[in-house]
UniProtKB/Swiss-Prot annotation:
Keyword Membrane: yes
Gene Ontology MF term list: cytoskeletal motor activity
Database matches in NCBIfam families: PRK00249.1-4
Key words of the record: Bacterial flagellum, Cell outer membrane, Lipoprotein, Membrane, Palmitate, Signal
Entry function: Assembles around the rod to form the L-ring and probably protects the motor/basal body from shearing forces during rotation.
Source domain of life: Bacteria
Record protein name field: Flagellar L-ring protein
Subunit architecture: The basal body constitutes a major portion of the flagellar organelle and consists of four rings (L,P,S, and M) mounted on a central rod.
Record-stated family: Belongs to the FlgH family.
Membrane topology according to the record: Lipid-anchor
């Protein structure tokens, strides 16, 4: 039974499967209102005892010699972004293989094969030979340079027992062509915070900095699925 539409259907299914695999290689798009980067509210203090007539009352103390730097959960701190990174990588590989094989048979069941050919020509001789050569060369290069400047104001999410501040937050900007976001999380030492309540991003330990976006501008910087196929490990050549 002939089914002329089956090969075309198979090609369609294979194409859809390939597109699905390639789409899985694309980095997921960040979405707003991520609960991990939501502002952390200060812990509710315990209710103070009623006024007992003393001059000093708990809950009304003020630090006369301190500053306004963040040091508690829920405090706000501004992070100054000053990130510059450049990386390059090159790889070259070359492989070659040559092989030669020969088989000669001059006798069969004890009888020589170099007798006269009854139909004329050369003597009978069973022999075979094989010569092969294979060469593979590859060359790949990659270079990347990034720069990120600006500022993001985040909140203190936790205070570790040694006084280190765990901070995280994000900034969303809606532009004409889409949304731009900057997310940052990490650990800040209180001594690195300046008097104006700012800290450089280079002083953040275990920093997680994300700069991404959505919309037409972000889409133009992404290669199409056909280009990703030729740059993926699925490409056989």
């Amino acid at each position: 039974m002939n089914r002329p539409g089956f090969p075309r259907f198979s090609v369609l299914i294979a194409s859809l499967c390939g597109i699905t695999l390639l789409s899985g290689c694309v980095a997921p798009t960040a979405k707003p209102n991520d609960p991990y980067y939501a502002p952390v509210l200060p812990r509710t203090p315990m209710s103070a005892a009623s006024n007992n007539g003393a001059i000093y009352q708990a809950g009304f103390e003020q630090n006369l010699y301190g500053d306004r730097k963040a040091f508690r959960v829920g405090d706000i701190i501004t992070i100054t972004l000053s990130e510059r990174m450049a990386a390059s990588k090159a790889a070259t590989s070359a492989m070659s293989k040559d092989s030669t094989n020969s088989i000669g048979l001059t006798s069969l069941f004890g009888s020589g094969l170099t007798t006269n050919n009854p139909i004329g020509g050369n003597d009978l001789s069973l022999s075979a030979g094989y010569n092969g050569a294979r060469t593979t060369k590859g060359d790949g290069k990659a270079a990347q340079s990034n720069s990120l400047t600006g500022s993001v104001t985040v909140t203190v999410a936790d205070v570790l027992p040694n006084g280190i501040l765990s901070v995280r937050g994000e900034k969303w900007m809606t532009l004409n062509t889409g949304d731009e976001l900057v997310r940052i999380a990490g650990l800040v030492r209180a001594d690195d915070i300046a008097t104006d309540n700012t800290v450089s991003s280079t002083r953040i330990a275990d920093a997680r900095i994300t700069y991404s976006g959505t919309g037409a501008f972000a889409d133009t910087s992404q290669p199409g699925w056909f280009d990703r196929f030729f740059l993926s490990p699925l490409f056989p050549f």
